[in-house]
């Protein structure tokens, strides 16, 4: 997939996981975005569910680039809407 900053990201499935001692969100393998991407959301949301929980993420995501050139997906907690596992 070509990374285009500012591009709309369609619906995909993501999961919570541990990285550097923190709970993070990432797309699962085989989705429309690489699993190496991280999804920016509130810490309260990420920590509300067991690690390994899967979610269906609806339309409304956009690719952004941080000051350190990291590409990530910005998400509102209301867009991450359905737990499908755990």
Language model features: what each stretch is:
Residues 52-67:
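Flexible glycine-rich surface loops and low-complexity tracts that mediate binding to linear polymers
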Residues 32-48:
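Beta-strand/loop nucleic-acid-binding surfaces
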Residues 29, 43, 59-63:
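Short glycine-rich, polar/acidic loop-and-turn segments at beta strand-coil junctions
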Residues 14, 39, 57-59:
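Short, surface-exposed loop motifs enriched in S/T, G, D/E and P with embedded aromatic residues
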Residues 70-86:
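Short peripheral tails and domain-boundary helices/loops at the edges of structured domains
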Residues 21-36:
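Short, basic/aromatic beta-hairpin or loop at an interaction surface
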Residues 1-20:
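Structural detector for short beta-strands of small beta-barrel domains
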């Amino acid at each position: 997939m070509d990374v285009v900053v500012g591009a709309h990201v369609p619906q995909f499935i993501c999961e919570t996981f541990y990285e550097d001692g923190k709970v993070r969100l990432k797309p699962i393998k085989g989705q429309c975005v690489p699993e190496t991407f991280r999804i920016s959301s509130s810490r309260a949301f990420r920590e509300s569910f067991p690690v390994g929980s899967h979610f269906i993420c609806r339309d409304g995501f956009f690719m952004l680039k941080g000051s350190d050139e990291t590409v990530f997906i910005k998400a509102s907690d209301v867009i991450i809407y359905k737990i499908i596992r755990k």
